[in-house]
Amino acid sequence: MATLLQEENTTSLEAIPSNTTAKTRPTVLVFDSGVGGLSVYQEVRQLLPDLHYIYAFDNVAFPYGEKSEEFIVERVLEIVSAVQQRHPLAIVIIACNTASTVSLPALRERFTFPVVGVVPAIKPAARLTANGVVGLLATRGTVQRTYTHELIARFATDCKIELLGSSELVELAEAKLHGEAVPLPTLKKILHPWLSMREPPDTVVLGCTHFPLLAEELMQVLPEGTRLIDSGAAIARRTAWLISTQENLVSTQEDNLAYCMALNEDTDALLPVLQGYGFKSLKKLPV
């Protein structure tokens, strides 16, 4: 069975002891095209349980994996701006690999608050691999983008990197959160290029925030001893540091809430799931 690791962290994180009062409860926006960013939110909230969290997802333009870079940048700017007009944001986490690889410069130019992105954990994977074969499991867009290949060239020149892009895995993760079972034969078909290799990757980077939601099923399908690595814990530590270095943060006593771009039957079904993650309500964000 495969093993799930987190970037530069192989033990569970303990929550930072809380001395948070109403005066120090700043707002954190976690954004993704879908629900995959909940995997990042879980890690951040585990470390920083007493902040005010907003989760926003773009269920109108989902998925981002095969959208143009220009569209993604403009869309993310529009959504973050709409949230910022309604809430005093202390920090924004772009919990989407695709959006992170193209929109971070524009976001940091537009806004004064810190913006944290998610990038594939190529560097720790290259350090951990024993057989020198690292798999990057991501969307097709992330696999093809120049940024990803620059990461590989910078941190993994001594490794053989096997790239596997799949939008179907994103759909499977979304379906799982809606209560549907993940068919293992489908996973095996998607992963066939690796499973049929004489020496498959012994370390797999989960290069999409949806994919940690499928970790249990992936570990059943991948070869014994395969390590799975995601960036959630590293993002949580980065967020904690950035919050600790800011002064005069605006606090709120509002409940955690989620925003979508359109309300429909799917979002009605998703509301109990979001409530299970600590979000009291789900609202449409006018954009």
Curated annotation (Swiss-Prot):
Annotated source species: Serratia proteamaculans (strain 568)
Pathway linked to the protein: Cell wall biogenesis; peptidoglycan biosynthesis
Pfam families: Asp_Glu_race
PROSITE patterns noted in UniProt: ASP_GLU_RACEMASE_1, ASP_GLU_RACEMASE_2
Single Gene Ontology MF annotation: glutamate racemase activity
Active-site residue list: 96, 208
Entry superkingdom: Bacteria
Entry keyword set: Cell shape, Cell wall biogenesis/degradation, Isomerase, Peptidoglycan synthesis
The protein, known as: Glutamate racemase
Signal sequence, start to end: none
Broadest EC class assigned to this enzyme: isomerase
Family under the similarity heading: Belongs to the aspartate/glutamate racemases family.
Residues involved in substrate binding: 32-33, 64-65, 97-98, 209-210
Function: Provides the (R)-glutamate required for cell wall biosynthesis.
Record-listed E.C. numbers: 5.1.1.3
One GO term of the biological process aspect: regulation of cell shape
Catalysed reactions, as listed in the record: L-glutamate = D-glutamate
